């Protein structure tokens, strides 16, 4: 059986990357929350 996780750097960046987060209002909320929490890495 094929595994569900098939890593791809492009897909990873496009869906979870900084620019992807920045693009939507909810994504910007995610960045805001992570900054408030003091996360070292905001995105992938």
Curated annotation (Swiss-Prot):
Biased composition (Basic residues): 1-38
Gene3D superfamilies cross-referenced by the UniProt entry: 1.10.287.3980
InterPro entries: Ribosomal_bL34, Ribosomal_bL34_CS
A Pfam family the protein falls into: Ribosomal_L34
Region (Disordered): 1-44
Family note: Belongs to the bacterial ribosomal protein bL34 family.
PANTHER family reported for this sequence: LARGE RIBOSOMAL SUBUNIT PROTEIN BL34M, MITOCHONDRIAL RIBOSOMAL PROTEIN 34 FAMILY MEMBER
UniProt-recorded name of the protein: Large ribosomal subunit protein bL34
Taxonomic source organism: Petrotoga mobilis (strain DSM 10674 / SJ95)
Taxon lineage: Bacteria, Thermotogati, Thermotogota, Thermotogae, Petrotogales
Encoding gene (name): rpmH
């Amino acid at each position: 059986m094929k595994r569900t996780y098939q890593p791809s750097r492009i897909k990873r960046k496009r869906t979870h990357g900084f620019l992807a987060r920045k693009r939507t209002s909810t994504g910007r909320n995610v960045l805001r929350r992570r900054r408030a929490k003091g996360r070292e890495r905001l995105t992938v």
